[in-house]
Regions:
Chain B
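N-terminal export/assembly segments and adjacent metallocofactor-ligating motifs
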Residues: 1-281, 289, 313, 319, ...
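Domain-level signature for respiratory redox metalloenzymes
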Residues: 62, 141, 145, 199-206, ...
């Protein structure tokens, strides 16, 4: 009896530790200085992803919008919302918003956004679920298999140095 | 209770959880712009064309800018002066931009004047101090305002000149330790034209240089360096020959086919010795000109007589004369080492005479005098303000020091990188005199020796953050003009000096406001160039306007019948018994007059001759060193009748015996951590003497003595990669 209770205590403490550690890491990834809602912007207001991520058509990086770009609309829209007030404060202090990175590819890969976007690949192909969430999440793991599956299906280059340059 | 086994299990589990629970990705930050710079593309570079202001040569540059930050400066391939090339000093312009010691806010004196103690203040307060001072002066005595700057060109000079003229003060002085006064005076005497000539080195077959270190310093080192490469290598059957005369083996001299060491200040005699042989042997195209020169006294400049004065072998003079005359077109040029003597004009006139005698004026591969102001004729009398003659202003500065002491000035406006408190001979006591001016306002990016003496410092942007225009003093055939534009947003809270003057003029009202009727300097430039029919957008894209059609050069009225330069001997201060060695000072390739000393890239640039970095040295001939008991790397005190300084000995076989050579540029007491306390300042050894013909500062005019001394630290010289260099092996 005593032994079983001890075992239960062990398992409970182990679980608690794992949960704590995991939760801490998860909250660091999903928490952002501003709780930006992708769903509202993309679905409710039908905004094109490229309005904010405007260098996706031009450069390798899709880009994070400048504070100025947020303020183009939020000077007049939803100014009383607590999250918008935070943006206004950054703008007032002329400070950039320190976003936490969610999606990241390893350094040994080269992923030119503009090639995919200009070839007509929808953003949601690689960033599924982004239209349903508020704070950005990475639902799709970017393994080489994931990339190659699509490259093969479309008959585009699968040479090593297309991506590993 | 826990037994040992459970304790271990729990411990293991905790370690596992701690390790793998925390083994998730640490979030990285993505920091977007608050306001993105125009045309920014992430990860993509933009190239902006502008012009370099690290030295007065006026090279065109293109700057690679990525995400709003300047990353690299290159030469502008379209610019006629440098055609895509750029020197180390130009490259180091980035360090000035990002320098941690740059002045970022207006500074107000917070201790006694000259203490270098300043406190930051707002632009509102700083400008109100400036305006209160100017308004008081305007009402009481406008002529007691002094403006002392570096030589400026283009519209910023126009703005400064109009401001001072309308304010009512004649005291506008531009100081440049390496002004071309002697060259201007020599060309006026020989050719009847007071201008800097264009040397077509690229197409020359023979090049004579008299202490002219044109590859490293001088009027336009990048332009001449490129042309020199063409002279040597761009023609399939001709490799131009280069002979260098001078008291020191500079980098330029080391490039020559023949280096002929001569006594300091005897460059003019050497040139006339060559002229003598050319006339005697009838090697000149114009017999009439030759005859009149011969009668005027050239007959006395025999190779033997010249050999005695210069230390040259008469046979060398004969040989060079024959080669120079037989390999037309050729060029004779003389530079700072010859111009900086008390007979500088004579030395330079000697070289100019050789060009006239050989018939090299106005021909390809010779020298010419382009009409560089042709494009600005609509400015009338103001046109000359856009490209003022590159004079040193030494006489005016000396006069102004007197006036400071007498209390003529009640306010001084200072700007520019020539730093008079550092680069004027110490006996002049410029700094002391400046302290007696009641109010001194500096426009500066760094707290150098001069700015430290002021009571208000207004921070100005670096050339990479400026609007402006420029006309290079040499290196183009006519009206090529450069456009400066900010390649990045200003890093600090700075304002351009012309902008401050225009704003001040608006507040002062009346004639001053009418003279500067623009909202700002950018508007001044744009209105002015729009009036000239310049397509500003294209000009800024290309870095300037570079016309393909060359305007006709100016004619040199006396080129056919040059007069013989009046012979003059170089004078040297100091009793030869007490000060046995001639002092030869030369601008450092990295720091010039000292303006580059605050940039660590330039400090760690090895000197091309000695490979020394970060400190000061004195080049001594091995025989002289042996007599004085000095060895390579020893510390010495170099003393002249006017001052003394410390330096390390570099024993160098190609320094003439009896001469010691010191690079200028080090020896700062202020100007930031990279510059301060790196040996002595050679300007402190110099007398207040001028070239008799032109009034230029005569730096090569004193003798010195060397005394062994124990100095802290040592001279660092980088590894020599060209193989064995020990002088014992080549002596």
């Amino acid at each position: 009896m005593l032994r079983r209770r001890r075992q239960a205590a062990l398992v409970a403490s182990l679980l608690a530790l794992l949960l704590l550690g995991g939760a801490a890491a998860a909250s660091a990834l999903t928490s952002q200085p501003i709780r930006y809602n992708h769903n509202v912007h993309v679905v409710a207001y039908k905004m094109d992803c490229r309005f904010c991520h405007s260098s996706a058509m031009k450069t390798a990086s899709a880009g994070i919008p400048s504070v100025e770009k947020c303020m183009i609309c939020h000077r007049v829209i939803a100014v009383d919302h607590p999250e918008i007030k935070k943006i206004a404060q950054y703008w007032k202090e002329k400070k950039p918003i320190p976003w936490n990175r969610v999606t990241e590819l390893p350094d040994y890969t080269y992923f030119p956004h503009f090639r995919m976007v200009n070839a007509g690949i929808a953003c949601l192909t690689c960033h599924p679920g982004m239209d349903k969430v508020d704070v950005a999440v990475q639902e799709q793991e970017f393994t080489m298999g994931f990339c190659l599956k699509c490259h093969k299906a479309r008959g585009v280059s699968i040479e090593c140095w297309s991506c590993h340059i | 209770m826990l037994d040992r086994r459970d304790f271990l299990k729990l411990g293991g589990a905790t370690a596992f959880a701690a390790l793998f629970g925390g083994c998730d990705r640490i979030p990285k930050k993505i920091i977007p712009f608050v306001i993105p710079p125009e045309n920014t593309a992430l990860g993509e570079s933009l190239w902006y064309a502008s012009a370099c202001r690290q030295c007065p040569a006026g090279c065109g540059i293109v700057v690679r800018v990525s995400e709003g930050r300047a990353k690299k400066i290159e030469g502008n391939p379209l610019h006629p002066v440098n055609r895509g090339k750029l020197c180390a000093r130009g490259q180091a312009g980035l360090q000035a931009l990002y320098h941690p010691e740059r002045i970022g806010r207006p500074l107000k004196l917070s201790g006694p004047r000259g203490s270098g103690k300043f406190a930051e203040t707002s632009w509102e307060e700083a400008l109100s101090i400036l305006l209160t001072g100017l308004k008081k002066l305007q009402a009481a005595a406008p002529a007691s305002l002094l403006m002392l700057t570096e030589p400026m060109r283009g519209h910023r000079n126009l703005v400064a000149a109009r401001f001072m003229r309308a304010f009512g003060s004649p005291h506008r002085i531009a100081w440049d330790p390496f002004g071309q006064d002697a060259l201007l005076a020599a060309n006026e005497a020989v050719f009847g034209i007071r201008d800097v000539p264009e040397y077509d080195i690229a197409n020359a077959r023979y090049l004579l240089s008299f202490s002219g270190d044109f590859l490293e310093t001088g009027i336009s080192p990048v332009h001449y360096g490129r042309a020199y490469g063409q002279m040597r290598q761009s023609r399939p059957t001709v490799r131009g020959k280069f002979v260098h005369f001078g008291p020191r083996l500079s980098m330029t001299a080391a490039n020559a086919d023949v280096f002929l060491p001569i006594a300091p200040g005897s460059e003019g005699a050497a040139a006339l010795g060559i002229a003598h042989v050319m006339v005697r042997e009838k090697l000149t195209p114009s017999a009439a000109a030759a005859a009149s020169l011969w009668a005027a006294g050239l007959s006395r400049m025999t190779p033997e007589a010249v050999g005695k004065a210069t230390g040259l072998l008469p046979s060398d003079i004969e040989a060079v004369a024959h080669e120079f005359a037989g390999n037309a077109p050729g060029i004779a040029m003389a530079g700072d080492g010859a111009a900086g003597c008390t007979n500088g004009t004579y030395n330079l006139a000697g070289a100019a005479l050789l060009n006239a005698l050989a018939g090299n004026v106005g021909r390809q591969g010779g020298i010419s005098f382009p009409n560089r102001l042709a494009a600005f004729s609509r400015f009338g009398a103001d046109a000359a303000l856009l490209l003022p003659p590159p004079e040193s202003g030494f006489a005016s500065v000396r006069d102004s020091v007197e006036k400071m002491r007498k209390g003529t000035y009640r306010m001084a406006l200072l700007s520019g990188s020539t730093n008079p408190a550092f680069s004027l001979p110490a006996p002049l006591k410029f700094g002391e005199a400046l302290l007696s001016v009641p109010q001194v306002v500096s426009f500066a990016s760094f707290l150098d020796e001069t700015a430290s003496l002021s009571d208000l410092v207004l921070p100005v942007p670096t050339f990479l953050e400026e609007w402006g225009d420029d006309i290079a003093p040499a290196g183009h055939a006519g009206d090529a003009l450069s456009m400066l534009q900010p390649v990045v947003d200003p890093f600090r809270d700075t304002r351009q000096m012309p902008d401050i003057l225009i704003a001040a003029a608006r507040e002062l009202g009346g004639a001053v406001a009418a003279a500067l009727p623009w909202a700002g300097f950018r508007e001044c430039l744009e209105k002015s160039y729009a009036g000239m029919g310049v397509n500003l957008e294209a000009a800024r894209r290309d870095g300037g306007v570079f016309p393909g059609k060359t305007p006709a050069p100016r004619t040199a009225p006396k080129a056919q019948r040059p007069s013989l330069p009046v012979a003059a001997e170089a004078e040297f201060e100091g009793d030869p018994a007490r000060y046995p060695l001639f002092l030869h000072v030369y601008p450092s390739i990295a720091h010039s007059d000292g303006r580059g000393a605050n940039l660590s890239w330039l400090q760690e640039l090895p000197d091309p001759v000695t490979t020394a970095v970060w400190r000061n040295w004195v080049e001594v001939n091995p025989k002289t060193a042996e007599t004085l008991g000095l060895a390579d790397g020893d510390g010495v005190v170099v003393a002249s009748p006017f001052g003394s300084m410390e330096a390390f000995v570099v024993v160098h076989p190609a320094t003439a015996p009896g001469v010691v050579a010191l690079p200028l540029g080090q020896g700062h007491t202020r100007y930031g951590t990279n510059a301060a306390n790196r040996g002595g300042n050679p300007f402190s050894l110099l007398p207040v003497k001028a070239d008799r013909g032109s009034g230029a500062p005569a730096r090569q005019s004193t003798r010195v003595s060397l005394a062994k001394a124990k100095l802290a630290g040592s001279l660092v010289r980088t590894v020599n990669v060209e193989g064995q260099w020990k002088y014992e092996n080549i002596l």
